[in-house]
Each structure stands twice: as C-alpha cells, then as structure tokens.
Amino acid sequence: MKRLTSLLLVLLLVVSCGKYKLPHSMDMLSSGCISDTRAGEDDFPALDPEDTAPELFLEYTPEGLAVTRKNAKLNCSIKNSGISCEATLSGNVLTYRAYETNGLQTNCLCLVQWMTSTVPGLQEDTEYTLEYTCGHEYLPIQFRYRKGMSLRFDLKMYEKY
C-alpha cells in the first residue's frame, strides 16, 4: 500500500507540473562570439552600429516556434561555457530565457551575431504572450502562433528601462 501511495504521489506530481510548467531546456545553435569589447562600452568598434542592432525573429515551424535572436550582447564567459536557453509555458504565457551557461562573469561583452532554438508544444492559432530575456529583460510581446507566421521585432523598442 505504501508503494502504491508513493507511486500515485509521483504520478500526481508529474501530471500537475506537466512539461509546460517546468523550465524546458532546448538545444541552441549560435554564431558564437564574433566580436568583443570591454563591459560598459556601448558599441563594438570594429563593427558598424547598424550591423549590431538587436532583433528578435519568431517563426512558425512544424516542430514548434523558432526563436532567433540577432546581435545579442552576452558576457564573454560564453567563449568557454556556451549559451543555454530554456522556456516555460504557463497558460498562454511563454517565458523564454537565453543566458551564459556558466554564471562566472568577466569584464567583457561578446556580440553573438545569431542564436536560434525551437520551442515545442505551442497550440496552433492561439494567442501567446512572450516574456523574453537575453542579457536584458524585454517588455512582453504578443503574437498569434499559426502557419505562415514570421515576425521581426526591433528589441531596442522593447527594452525595459
């Protein structure tokens, strides 16, 4: 009886949390660090500022929501430890976070030209609110997930101040 009760509690926990309530780690591909600068400097001297504007692209794919970030400024620790990302879906709120895998910070910022991952499990033709974090926190972005969806966001407009 004790084993059955324990098994039922574990099953209840798994069902109640669901795969959407807990952070879901995803594979991420990226360009890696293409340029770096000292922390506190606003630009990358070797690059045209037009080429370093932060952008976010959301696209429908059969596998899930493709999230592509262009021109992310992350800590140079990614050169050794890489970038991780995770998503949590709670109701219609999708929280997406990309971050340096190793929490050790250096006095250096690295420009990542692009990084992309796919978030599975969204329902087609449904409105979602994306809470996106990558280096900065951004204001919520609303979108409808459906076939043919391809959205571009200038992230400077969405930065929280």
Indicate where each model-derived feature is located.
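Sec-dependent N-terminal signal peptides
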Residues: 4-14
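Exposed, flexible binding/inhibitory loops of compact, secreted disulfide-stabilized domains
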Residues: 17-161
